[in-house]
Amino acid sequence: MSGHTSFYCGLLLLLLIQVQARPRADDSLQVLSRLLEDEYGHFNSEELNNEAQEISPAASLPDLNTDQSDLELPWDRESREIGGRSFRQEALLARLLQDLSNNPLRFKGRSKKGPSRSCFGLKLDRIGAMSGLGC
């Protein structure tokens, strides 16, 4: 068995030496850049710069004449919403517990036939039934 393993390892080593297995990152980057240029070549850098300049920096700033409610911080908004969330979570939890209490449990006991009604238990009852012994 070890002879076959060493033979296959040697064959693999010989193939790796012949192929000169090295990463070819330069080639893959060139291929990727060519593919991207083919796919998205219709976008020039000038067009991208023009589109970036069309979006004014003033449009990205918030309006200074807005309400105070618009300017509140995210954590303030979250703390205000916590009361509503906790009420919803409590209602959901109550409904879940009520559903669990109303529905019968799927697994009741050892088997579908009910509890064992024998004197000695399930395994001993089988042995007694086969041997003719009774309770």
Swiss-Prot record:
- Please list the GO terms describing molecular function: hormone activity
Q: Where is the signal peptide?
A: 1-25
The superkingdom of the source organism is Eukaryota
Which Pfam families does the record associate with it? ANP (PF00212)
Instruction: List the GO cellular component terms.
Output: extracellular region
Q: Which residues form a coiled coil?
A: none
What GO terms describe the biological role, i.e. biological process, of this protein?
blood vessel diameter maintenance; cGMP biosynthetic process; receptor guanylyl cyclase signaling pathway
Which pairs are disulfide-linked?
A: 119-135
Q: Which UniProt keywords apply?
A: Cleavage on pair of basic residues, Disulfide bond, Hormone, Secreted, Signal, Vasoactive
Give the primary localization class.
Answer: secreted
Q: Which SMART domains match?
A: NAT_PEP
| Residues excised as propeptide | 26-113
User: Region (Disordered): which ranges?
Assistant: 46-67
Localization in the cell: Secreted
The record's section on PANTHER family has: C-TYPE NATRIURETIC PEPTIDE (PTHR12167), C-TYPE NATRIURETIC PEPTIDE 3-LIKE PRECURSOR (PTHR12167:SF5)
Physiological role: Hormone which may be vasoactive and natriuretic. Has a cGMP-stimulating activity.
| Record family assignment | Belongs to the natriuretic peptide family.
User: Under which name does UniProt file this protein?
Assistant: C-type natriuretic peptide
